[in-house]
């Protein structure tokens, strides 16, 4: 199942909700959201800096991943960016492929 890194930032009412509910209840809500689309959360970490929360999760396909991100972003409580993750085997396979390419000016 494809793995993704979700970069989450709380905004406005989302920050107030986090302060009211705490992190554990937000984890339960996130687990439910992922599961409702056939996915699961591998790990979830709060942070401080440019990103409030990092979630590594498995999703069955890109459409489900986009549906999750759209729904979360539409809530207005947070913003979400997704990054597809690759395994070492994926990188090995990619490194064996050689596309035809000419650099600009060459």
What are these regions (language model features)?
Residues 1-106:
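A compositional/biophysical signature of low hydrophobicity enriched in polar/charged and small residues
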């Amino acid at each position: 199942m494809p793995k993704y890194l979700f970069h989450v930032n709380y905004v406005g009412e989302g920050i107030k909700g986090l302060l009211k509910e705490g992190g554990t209840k937000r984890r339960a809500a996130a687990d439910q959201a992922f599961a409702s689309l056939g996915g699961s959360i591998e790990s979830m970490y709060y942070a401080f800096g440019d990103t409030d929360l990092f979630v590594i999760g498995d999703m069955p396909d890109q459409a489900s991943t986009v549906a999750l991100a759209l729904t979360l972003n539409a809530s207005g409580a947070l913003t979400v960016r997704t990054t597809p993750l690759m395994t070492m085997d994926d990188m090995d396979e990619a490194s064996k492929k050689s596309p035809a390419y000419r650099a600009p000016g060459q």
